[in-house]
Amino acid sequence: MLRKGDLTQGGITTTLLQFTLPMLAGSLLQQCYNIADTLIVGQCIGANALAAVGSAYTLMVFLISILLGLSMGSGTVFSLQYGAGDLSALRRSIYVSFLLIGTVTILLNVAVFLWLDPILRWLQVPYDIYSLMRNYLWIIFWGIVFTFLYNFYAALLRAVGDSVTPLWFLAVSVVLNIGLDLFLILVLDQGIEGAAVATVIAQGTAASGILLYTYKIRPELRLHREDMRFDRSSLREITSFSTLTCVQQSVMNFGILMVQGLVNSFGTVVMAAFAAAVKIDSFAYMPVQEFGNAFSTFIAQNFGARKGDRIRRGVRSAFLITIVFSLIISLLVFFFAKPLMLIFVRPDEAEILRIGTEYLRIEGVFYLGIGILFLLYGYYRAIRMPGMSVVLTILSLGTRVVLSYWLASIPTIGVTGIWWSIPIGWLLADAVGMLYYKYCALRAANMQSHGLDKNPPPIYIYYRIFLSLQP
């Protein structure tokens, strides 16, 4: 019998695309909201408020990435258990994961409230926006529990093959947030505090809605008394996935921060060009990023169900889809780089336009590299090897940072070296990830999926792989 959200049956290509589209729509919706929120704050309150919200957003992303990493890691475990048809284990994992991430959320909230002022001073927030940023963050972090609840249940529903429901609740949240922004800022004149309150109310609505939906509509995910016990094996498995996913997210943010610092050293023109180009860049590769996340859930469910042949066919299908889509996007970005930059830059800002166009044409040629890398991230998370995803992230961003600083220091190369370091990092990580897939990962996955050990220590796996490679 085909279960709702079951990715272990049906046509592979159709299943992958149908599961990806709502996730992609959600990401696009979130990006559109970010742009709309920026415009409302900037146009209706002023430049200082815009700077405060922008700076606060960077800090929020870093802190909330901890919760996102925990939810993503838990989602992989949920997918494995759902694919295996072990609903009892799934419910126990839901309970343990909820307690774990809920506890981290509370501790994070307490830490922010206790050390918000020292954090802002460490970030060297200018005096003229200090109070604005502090007030905004103080209100926002009262609602962090809603961020936890929405992301937890969204990850759970996606893990069991439902990527549509989280999209609907996100859409309601975005529309409500924009409406409340306009009402609280324009009508009630609440300023930046009104923007923060609007965000918290919208997040609370989405969190409450998705929680009630899961409880009422998905009875197989509803916890029973016997499920509410602290299972150490579930905690160990969830922690191993979630911790590594958090490390991956932190490494990504830190690497991006270091490159941003180098870009800033070249002055405001380069900073402006980079800021505009990165917005276009993130939109361009967003589809392959979401496809990689959908692919991870597909692999995890089939890995849990021990459907090795379907996994292999899924890998081939996913790579083909990624290649075709990446090439199309590469062509569009390469040939329309200048018109795309003109969305954010005035025609008379010739130098900004030139630098941004150069960036997009260099990155655009290599979108296949980032597309494959997202597939590799998702694949290794799904087959119980999240550590390999971390290794590839460190390799990609480490290469980017080292090459950026080295190439940018050469006068004849300069800032262009930063642009080239990014795809070089992607391609190097791709090469390592694909070689590992060919020579090691398939053997390791086969050992685990055939019950050699449910979750053996990595050293044991690698030792067995080493022995299997000997002549």
Identify the role of each PLM range.
Residues F62-S65, N177-D181, A207-L211, F283-M286, ...:
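Hydrophobic transmembrane alpha-helices of multi-pass small-molecule transporters
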Residues M1-T20, F78-G143, V187-T243, I299-F366, ...:
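Short alpha-helical transmembrane segments in multi-pass integral membrane proteins
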Residues Q18-D37, I139, Y150, S173, ...:
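Transmembrane helical elements of multi-pass membrane transporters/channels
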Residues L50-V110, T147-P166, A273-A337, I370-R384, ...:
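Small-residue-rich hydrophobic transmembrane alpha-helices
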Residues L28, C32-L50, L120-Y127, F183-Q190, ...:
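Helix-terminus/linker motif at the lipid-water interface of multi-pass membrane proteins
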Residues A47, A51-T58, L137, A196, ...:
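Small-residue hotspots at the loop-to-helix junctions and early N-terminal turns
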Residues L7-I45, T58-G73, V77, G102-N109, ...:
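N-terminal transmembrane alpha-helices
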Residues S71, I140-R158, P166-V174, A195-S208, ...:
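Short runs within selected transmembrane alpha-helices of multi-pass transporters and secretion channels
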